[in-house]
Amino acid sequence: MLTIALPKGALLNESIQIFQKIGLDFSAFLDSKNRQLQITDPTNQAKALLVRATDVPVYVEYGQAQLGIAGYDVLLEKSPDVANLIDLKFGYCRMSVAVPADSPYQSPLDIPHHGKVASKFVNCAKDYFRRLDIPVEIIPLYGSVELGPITGMSEAIVDLVSTGRTLRENGLVEIDELFASSARLIAHPLSYRLDRDQIYNWVEKLREPTTSMAKV
């Protein structure tokens, strides 16, 4: 039976919807009374695991799930050994550098050497500033990253931005974009090669709704 890792949080609703379009129903995860973390599709063709968004690539990499849905940001941050198969065309956001609106820094190049940057995307932030050849200290924060510059702990932050509302409400502005992110279908590489007949069919079915969405 096919096992799929689905992410908790912002990507869950649309992840379930896209599987519904190809005949797999995991909508029980959306029931407020549901406490199960593993459910089987009513047709008994597949089961789904409900896991933290950052853990989806882990379950896929270690073979506990053959397919999964993960944000491109998570894939860049974690660099898992998985096959990145399809851009699913939802969950759009961007990874940005932001500073206080009254900051003298108008560009990342203005951030002083050995300045401090708060982020929960430590690897993405390190890679970005390394490419710019700017030595900075990355401070790992895993909640309310905006408080870094507000409290004076950091000069800037690197974080995901969707509408930008949270930044604006906390007096922050974007000064650069690292990359755009969206939901991706990922697969366990060995399973995708060895069990290609089963997995390939599902992957091709998933390409159809995403192709249609791209044409709208």
Swiss-Prot record:
<keyword id="KW-0808">Transferase</keyword>
<dbReference type="InterPro" id="IPR001348">
    <property type="entry name" value="ATP_PRibTrfase_HisG"/>
</dbReference>
<dbReference type="InterPro" id="IPR024893">
    <property type="entry name" value="ATP_PRibTrfase_HisG_short"/>
</dbReference>
<keyword id="KW-0028">Amino-acid biosynthesis</keyword>
<dbReference type="GO" id="GO:0003879">
    <property type="term" value="F:ATP phosphoribosyltransferase activity"/>
</dbReference>
<dbReference type="Pfam" id="PF01634">
    <property type="entry name" value="HisG"/>
</dbReference>
<dbReference type="InterPro" id="IPR013820">
    <property type="entry name" value="ATP_PRibTrfase_cat"/>
</dbReference>
<protein>
    <recommendedName>
        <fullName>ATP phosphoribosyltransferase</fullName>
        <ecNumber>2.4.2.17</ecNumber>
    </recommendedName>
</protein>
<keyword id="KW-0368">Histidine biosynthesis</keyword>
<dbReference type="GO" id="GO:0000105">
    <property type="term" value="P:L-histidine biosynthetic process"/>
</dbReference>
<keyword id="KW-0328">Glycosyltransferase</keyword>
<keyword id="KW-0547">Nucleotide-binding</keyword>
<dbReference type="GO" id="GO:0005524">
    <property type="term" value="F:ATP binding"/>
</dbReference>
<keyword id="KW-0963">Cytoplasm</keyword>
<comment type="function">
    <text>Catalyzes the condensation of ATP and 5-phosphoribose 1-diphosphate to form N'-(5'-phosphoribosyl)-ATP (PR-ATP). Has a crucial role in the pathway because the rate of histidine biosynthesis seems to be controlled primarily by regulation of HisG enzymatic activity.</text>
</comment>
<comment type="pathway">
    <text>Amino-acid biosynthesis; L-histidine biosynthesis; L-histidine from 5-phospho-alpha-D-ribose 1-diphosphate: step 1/9.</text>
</comment>
<comment type="subunit">
    <text>Heteromultimer composed of HisG and HisZ subunits.</text>
</comment>
<dbReference type="GO" id="GO:0005737">
    <property type="term" value="C:cytoplasm"/>
</dbReference>
<keyword id="KW-0067">ATP-binding</keyword>
<comment type="similarity">
    <text>Belongs to the ATP phosphoribosyltransferase family. Short subfamily.</text>
</comment>
<dbReference type="InterPro" id="IPR018198">
    <property type="entry name" value="ATP_PRibTrfase_CS"/>
</dbReference>
